[in-house]
From Swiss-Prot:
Protein name, as recorded: Ribosome-recycling factor
Principal place of residence: cytoplasm
Similarity field: Belongs to the RRF family.
The keyword Protein biosynthesis is annotated on this UniProt entry: yes
Gene3D superfamilies: 3.30.1360.40, Ribosome-recycling factor
CDD domains per record: RRF
The protein's role, per its UniProt record: Responsible for the release of ribosomes from messenger RNA at the termination of protein biosynthesis. May increase the efficiency of translation by recycling ribosomes from one round of translation to another.
A Pfam family: RRF
Gene Ontology cellular component terms for the protein in this record: cytoplasm
UniProt keywords, alphabetically: Cytoplasm, Protein biosynthesis
Gene name, Swiss-Prot/TrEMBL: frr
InterPro entries xref list: Ribosome_recyc_fac, Ribosome_recyc_fac_dom, RRF_sf
GO biological process, one term: translational termination
Lineage, broadest ranks: Bacteria, Pseudomonadati, Spirochaetota, Spirochaetia, Spirochaetales
Organism the protein comes from: Borrelia duttonii (strain Ly)
């Protein structure tokens, strides 16, 4: 029974970490350099994360400064940002890119909350798939007479209880993110 608990905690813990990681790249009321985690630059024929070819800083609440380590990449970085789904317009002064980030409109905030909700739902589905996988494993063990019917019932109840815990955790993370996004 402990093997199920450990396996469930490991797999569902990874789902929660994945959700938190995806939420870092969503734009909120606050400017965050993690917005650029999914921006890739063509660096000598390789798609390279922007964070590996430039320093990204947030000197002011609504300003992002991107300083490439190799100045020849400035135009490629600018193009990568323009081609991304961030809806940002960088301005170049020859050595750094500056991006003035406008305040999000209510409509845009609502769109981002919908996007966050979909991400949370996808992670809840992943959690339920893990539950399904572990339930099947336990049922197979009972069928093969490795565990008793009472043990099976206990294991299934434990798996369901832990699944409910992780689903509530995902809902809580979503609620916090939605509140953060809607903050003006």
């Amino acid at each position: 029974m402990e093997e199920y608990k450990a396996l469930l905690d490991e797999k569902m813990g990874r789902v929660v970490l994945s959700l938190e990681s995806e939420y870092k790249s969503l734009r909120t009321g606050r400017v965050n350099s993690a917005l650029f985690d999914k921006v890739f630059v063509d660096y000598y024929g390789e798609k390279t994360p922007l964070t590996r070819v430039a320093n990204i800083s947030v000197p002011e609440a609504r300003l992002i400064v991107i300083q490439p380590w190799d100045r020849s990449l400035l135009s490629k970085i600018e193009q990568a940002i323009l081609n991304s789904d961030l809806s940002m317009n960088p301005s170049s002064d020859g050595s750094v890119l500056r991006i003035k980030v406008p305040v999000l409109t209510i409509e845009r905030r609502k769109e981002i909350v919908k996007q966050a909700k979909k991400i949370a739902e996808d992670h809840k589905i992943a959690t339920r798939n893990i539950r399904h996988e572990l339930n099947n494993k336990a049922k197979k063990q009972e069928k093969d007479s490795q565990i008793t019917e009472d043990d099976l019932r206990r294991i299934l109840d434990d798996i369901q209880r832990d699944t409910n815990f992780y689903i509530k955790k995902i809902d809580g993370i979503f609620d916090l993110k939605a509140k953060e996004i809607m903050e003006v």
